[in-house]
Amino acid sequence: MSASHKKPTPTELASDAHKNRRVVNTVNRPTRNTPYHDRTEAGECLAQEILLALSGGGPATSPGHRLKGTSPLARREPVVVLGLCRGGVPVARTVARLLRVPFDFLVVRKLASEANPELAIGALAECGRTDSGRDVGKKEVPQKRLRSDARRGQKPGEPAQESGLPPDLERTFGVIEVLNRDILAHLPDAEAALTSARDRETEELRRRVMRYRAGKAPERLEGRRVILVDDGAATGATMRAAIASARKQGAAEVIVALPVAPEEVCGELRHEADKVICPWTPAFFMSVGSHYTHFPQIEDEEICEVIQRQE
């Protein structure tokens, strides 16, 4: 038998099977089927799955165990974990703490009509600049379903309006928009509904950016491996906006990490992210909160407290 056709040893086969199983589990087949106690436990679970998926199936840490020394993820290339506001922030903070990598947040808002607040017609995400200083939130995005809109009421090509943000934050602030055109196509008076939702949510997004960032610019994403974390996803609308924002800011790789989401949503996100890590894809998905034992509403004060502790 030639060297090129050498039969693999049982140890090699087992190792390959383990690696393949773990990577598939974190994306396709769930490794969990019981509710999380809270967002902290969800973050602990995600930290283990992320480490397994991105470090070639190496040994996992036990729940709550913090890695010693430099994270194996950070040793390979620059990594940053971004929590989607508001529910994803405590989950992401736990992930970043356990993996010993930088943490930041991303303000996102769902776009919905006032007639049906649960129906996502799109989403917004804050979008800053690349390290080269290139503006990333004020131009048309050449991707399907994406359109950027840096200021309330601003149309593509129009001069930027004043945002009311502090000067340091103003230089990095923009908004990127993702639309669900399939839903908009069947929505009565869609343009009016979209305009109303866009104005309303852009104003709220700006308010949250001012409150949470307190005048400080966000982490630079250009050339970095970006891990986007939320506490779950029902439609994936805000996560798609987050992916678009990270891409536009020059992320080298975009990884989505969710504790729980429908398999259909994970499948859609796989077309836009480089990797999707989701340990629980229940067959019957009611809501994100129904898959937690303790799932309180996250208030502004809690977000600010998490951010201050990070500093």
Specify the residue positions occupied by each region the protein language model found.
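PRPP-associated nucleotide enzymes
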Residues: 2-311
